[in-house]
């Protein structure tokens, strides 16, 4: 399937010079959404993960159905203050400031193999922080899969040493 044709491109959003890749047009098409999830499932299956981790918020839209298809659990990675229990956190630098990601402290066990699934690989900052967060728990990152990769932002360089898969590349 030509997944690219299901991605709406919105120029100058959220600011001038940005070409936004809108996945909602793929999500609303049942056949395309299922085919995209199935393609990611086949790639993730190869890494034999124990769990799928998806960063907030669009990582939930792909990570949860991938976990379901594989018959394994899904663990959400959230922004600070969104999880009710004890958490493990990782702070990372943004272009102008910093951000933090959290996961429940008991969600991931040492030695588990974890696959990260998200909608977009841009600069790699969020995914790199997610990987560090997983590794803080004593687990291993088994691979990373994305619906879209913006290759010109070179996020893959930041993820050297990890298996990275992208369904659509711009």
From Swiss-Prot:
One of its GO terms (molecular function) is adenine phosphoribosyltransferase activity. CDD domains: PRTases_typeI. It is an enzyme of class 2 (transferase). The keyword Transferase applies. It holds the Pfam family Pribosyltran. Its main location: cytoplasm. GO terms for cellular component: cytoplasm. GO terms for biological process: adenine salvage; AMP salvage; purine ribonucleoside salvage. The keyword Cytoplasm applies. Coiled coil: none annotated. InterPro entries: Ade_phspho_trans, PRibTrfase_dom, PRTase-like, UPRTase/APRTase. It catalyses: AMP + diphosphate = 5-phospho-alpha-D-ribose 1-diphosphate + adenine. Its EC number is 2.4.2.7. It is found in: Cytoplasm. Keywords: Cytoplasm, Glycosyltransferase, Purine salvage, Transferase. Pathway: Purine metabolism; AMP biosynthesis via salvage pathway; AMP from adenine: step 1/1. PANTHER family: ADENINE PHOSPHORIBOSYLTRANSFERASE. Homodimer. Belongs to the purine/pyrimidine phosphoribosyltransferase family. Catalyzes a salvage reaction resulting in the formation of AMP, that is energically less costly than de novo synthesis. HAMAP family: Aden_phosphoribosyltr. This is Adenine phosphoribosyltransferase. It comes from Desulfitobacterium hafniense (strain DSM 10664 / DCB-2).
